[in-house]
A protein has these predicted regions:
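Alpha-helical interface subdomain recognition
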Residues: 2-142
Length: 142
């Protein structure tokens, strides 16, 4: 069980890296993409959506740090923290990557853009060691 927890922490850290990359690349892209004579990053609705992406990745980062500390100190709540982390990673990862693809339009799913690859990676990671539904159920039973 400890090995599964450590592996889950590792893939969660990787997922947070993917989410952060999606956010950073989206911000860069929206600054360079122009519509109606101005960068699309100037539109408030898109700014709010990008802030949501940032918040989702920061929530996951905080849960990762909490789970790492509890696994290190061998507290009885480490399984619960790891399940909370994995459930949130599954939900937030897909949300952030799907939003990034939407910002990039059709280019977001092309092989030339890394955003589509991050989406595929985050969907695959959700299935490893139990998906978000599995960990939500496990969390509620602990």
């Amino acid at each position: 069980n400890n090995a599964i927890n450590i592996a889950t922490l590792c893939i969660s850290a990787e997922s947070i890296g993917c989410m952060t990359a999606c956010y950073v690349k989206t911000v860069e892209y929206t600054k360079s993409r122009e519509q109606f004579g101005q960068p699309i990053s100037n539109f408030q609705v898109l700014q709010h959506k990008m802030v949501d992406m940032f918040i989702e990745s920061e929530v996951c980062k905080s849960l990762l740090f909490k789970a790492m500390l509890e696994c290190e100190s061998n507290e009885g709540t480490k399984n619960k923290s790891v399940s909370a982390l994995k459930a949130q990673i599954g939900l937030s990862g897909k949300l952030v990557a799907q939003d990034a693809v939407q910002f990039h339009g059709g280019m977001g799913v092309s092989d030339e853009m890394s955003i589509g690859h991050y989406l595929k990676k985050l969907i695959a990671v959700d299935a490893l060691f139990g998906n978000s539904n599995y960990h939500l159920n496990k969390y509620s039973q602990l």
